[in-house]
Amino acid sequence: MPTTFRAYQPDQGLLLPEDMREWLPEGHLAHYVGDLVECMDLGAFYARYEGDGRRKSPYEPRMMVKVLIYGYATGVFSSRRLARKLEEDVAFRVLAAGNFPSHRTICEFRRRHLGDFRRLFVEVAQVASEAGVAKFGRLSVDGTKVRANASRRKAMSYGRMREEEARLEDEVAALLERAQSVDAEEDARFGQEFRGDGLPDELRRRADRLAKIRAAKARLEARQRESDDARGRRPGEKRDPRGGRPYKRDCGEPEAKAQDNFTDPESRIMKTSQDGFQQCYNAQLAVEGESRLVVAAEVSAEASDQGRMVPLLRAVESAHGTRPGTVLADAGHCNEADLATLGELGVDGYVALGREGRGEVAADAGKHPAKAAMAAKLATEAGRAQYAQRKWRAEAPIGWIKEALGFRRFSVRGLTKARGEWDLVCLALNVKRMNGLQAA
């Protein structure tokens, strides 16, 4: 008896169009993203299009926001990959509802609205709070180095800049002298009205390179002046007034090894856990206790985590009107000023004084009273039990971002844009996490 197969007619047209939403099973992340965005306040996104005089109608912002959030929540960050997914992936096609924006359109929309995703990030955290999923009483703070959209090979040290500046100045001067000699010869042969081709390409290339190096050198010097001023050093001082030892360099003069990147000048060389020293930004987040949702996020161009904890707590209070009662943080966030501020704010802090596994760290109560108090607290059994929760609370979201989503490098350049993209990443992670918690 012949086998009877199920009907298969790929060329058969449909008499009536199907509901695209039925292509995906109930509880799919795309459904959750679509429903959530429909309830969001997207006024800031629409406001940018009012009265801009466009001839061609732009794509609906709701659709673009859905595509970006779902894309980041599923590990698709590139505008080209997003555009390809809109043609090939069922979930993306359902969210876009028959729209196919190009990768340039997606990239421009993201660039144009990076600053607006902070509001959506805060709004989603508020939704989680109202639903009882997230509470802001106990937070864990952590940071991670995320690669900048720039190569460290495009960076140059201050010492090398000075050498290159001197070399290029000599070469430009020699080329200018040669060009003037040629001009004089041509004037004699063809007359002064003769017009050549302008600056020779060889001279133009060197002049452009010299201008870039001078700009980078000026950025490093401005950064160093700012740093010296913050430490109380004044121009003309040759010795440290506190210790009397002579300074190794003039005020405002960077160290020879200080570097600046030509592609993304605001990024910095930072040590990563796996890839050695890379061009990076320092991405910080504050995580809610049980749900492990991200409730505050920030990006810094400083490699150190010190000074990052209190701004995150203030961001939570500013956005949600509540001050956390407890905060957990690792040794990277420990400094006397921040620990003292926690006490002033009435926040019960558990911040390690040294790296885990290195034994207890002693603190001089006379010089560092806040550190000494913290050391005493962490020496108790209750203090150790509280701090032990930090690892699985704070480090899990960073692991999800880097391993599950695969976000290890910013797609944009500049500190402000990096902050906007980090907000989008944390927003997407929260949406994915909330969908999972709802299903559970």
Regions found by a protein language model. Give the residues of each.
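Anion-binding and metal-coordination hotspots
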Residues: 1, 7, 68, 75-88, ...
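Secretory-pathway/luminal and periplasmic proteins that interact with or process carbohydrate-rich
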Residues: 92-97
